[in-house]
């Protein structure tokens, strides 16, 4: 049976059973590629990126030895999405005012006037 690329897509997280070769995704049964915030809705700093990548690696390691089907990929994507919301709510991440569309998909930003 031929293997095909699996993917999980949320608003801010895309995960593929693939690796990037010459700027193209190529199926790989033992590798996952994370595409984070493809619409550039957030302003990322090194610390928040580090936390996301660390969480992604932890989630993958927890599933070591198991088949990574689309259900497992969705669970990983949902947990990473939850961490993004946590970082945003704690002020470790902010919305990008230059984003194509400002829809505050994870809630209105917290400001001193709203606190």
Curated annotation (Swiss-Prot):
Q: Does the keyword NAD apply?
A: yes
> Which pairs are disulfide-linked?
none
Q: Which InterPro entries match?
A: NdhM
What do the Gene Ontology cellular component annotations say?
plasma membrane-derived thylakoid membrane
Location of this chain's protein in the cell: Cellular thylakoid membrane
How this chain sits in the membrane, per its record, is: Peripheral membrane protein
The EC number on file is 7.1.1.-
The protein's superkingdom reads: Bacteria
Keywords noted in UniProt: Membrane, NAD, NADP, Plastoquinone, Quinone, Thylakoid, Translocase, Transport
Q: Which reaction does it catalyse?
A: a plastoquinone + NADH + (n+1) H(+)(in) = a plastoquinol + NAD(+) + n H(+)(out); a plastoquinone + NADPH + (n+1) H(+)(in) = a plastoquinol + NADP(+) + n H(+)(out)
The signal peptide stretch is none
Pfam name, any one: NdhM
Keyword Lipid metabolism in annotation: no
List the GO molecular function terms. Answer: oxidoreductase activity, acting on NAD(P)H, quinone or similar compound as acceptor; quinone binding
The Swiss-Prot or TrEMBL record describes its family as follows:
Belongs to the complex I NdhM subunit family.
Query: What binding partners and quaternary form does the record give?
Result: NDH-1 can be composed of about 15 different subunits; different subcomplexes with different compositions have been identified which probably have different functions.
Q: What does this protein do?
A: NDH-1 shuttles electrons from an unknown electron donor, via FMN and iron-sulfur (Fe-S) centers, to quinones in the respiratory and/or the photosynthetic chain. The immediate electron acceptor for the enzyme in this species is believed to be plastoquinone. Couples the redox reaction to proton translocation, and thus conserves the redox energy in a proton gradient. Cyanobacterial NDH-1 also plays a role in inorganic carbon-concentration.
Protein name per the record: NAD(P)H-quinone oxidoreductase subunit M
Q: Give the species this sequence originates from.
A: Prochlorococcus marinus (strain MIT 9215)
């Amino acid at each position: 049976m031929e293997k095909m690329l699996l993917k999980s897509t949320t608003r801010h997280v895309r995960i593929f059973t693939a690796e990037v070769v010459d700027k193209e995704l190529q199926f790989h049964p033992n590798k996952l590629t994370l595409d984070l915030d493809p619409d550039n809705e957030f302003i990322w700093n090194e610390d928040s990126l580090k936390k996301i990548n660390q969480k992604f690696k932890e989630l993958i390691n927890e599933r070591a030895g198991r088949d990574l089907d689309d259900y497992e990929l969705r669970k990983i994507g949902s947990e990473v999405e939850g961490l993004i919301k946590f970082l945003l709510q704690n002020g470790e991440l902010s919305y990008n005012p230059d984003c194509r569309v400002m829809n505050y998909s994870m809630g209105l930003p917290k400001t001193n006037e709203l606190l």
